[in-house]
């Protein structure tokens, strides 16, 4: 039987969903094949992990999806699920990951990057050619700070919300 430690939690705004993910994995893992332990990442001590144990990463957001957990585990020779540190870092940065997809001719929706101090020009063709759009922060999970904008008078408000994350 293989030892699996399911880590969840963390300090990000996605702690609650991470906890739900960890508990769901623990509840549904095949107990006849795996000896599973559910562990809050705050209690993880890499020096106590056995060599043949696999870490199942259920940590969402900062610390779990940005490459930091992957780096910690890889640097200590611990096997884990999911992508490598470099892949996680790249995916965490939406601008960089979108650029890589475009470079490799993978279709992505049109986008506009709005820098921190950039003044918004609603007469820009990008805005004029759309009935609605989504505003997302460059980093963080897939749902925090995301707004669908159908009234462009509310675009500034959506951008302010995204910048919180």
Model-derived regions, located:
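Flexible, glycine/proline-enriched loop segments at strand-loop-helix junctions
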Residues: 85-88, 110-114, 143-149
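ATP-grasp fold ATP-binding core
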Residues: 101-102, 126-146, 164-165
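Conserved ATP-binding module of the ATP-grasp superfamily
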Residues: 108, 144-165
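Short acidic/polar capping segments at secondary-structure boundaries
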Residues: 114-119, 138-142, 151-155
């Amino acid at each position: 039987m293989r030892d699996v430690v399911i880590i969840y939690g963390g300090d990000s705004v996605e702690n609650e969903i991470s906890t739900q993910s960890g508990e769901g994995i623990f509840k549904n893992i095949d107990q006849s094949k795996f000896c599973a332990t559910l562990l809050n990442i705050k209690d993880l001590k890499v020096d106590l992990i056995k060599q043949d144990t696999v870490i199942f990463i259920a940590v969402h957001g900062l610390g779990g999806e940005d490459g930091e957990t992957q780096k910690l585990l890889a640097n200590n020779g611990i096997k884990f699920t999911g992508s490598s540190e470099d892949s996680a870092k790249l995916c965490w940065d939406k601008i960089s990951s979108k650029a890589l997809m475009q470079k490799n001719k993978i279709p992505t929706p049109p986008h506009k990057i709005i820098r921190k101090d950039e003044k918004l020009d609603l007469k820009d063709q990008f805005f004029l050619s759309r009935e609605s759009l989504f505003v997302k922060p460059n980093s963080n999970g897939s749902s925090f700070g995301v707004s669908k904008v159908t009234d462009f008078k509310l675009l500034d408000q959506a951008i302010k919300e995204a910048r919180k994350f």
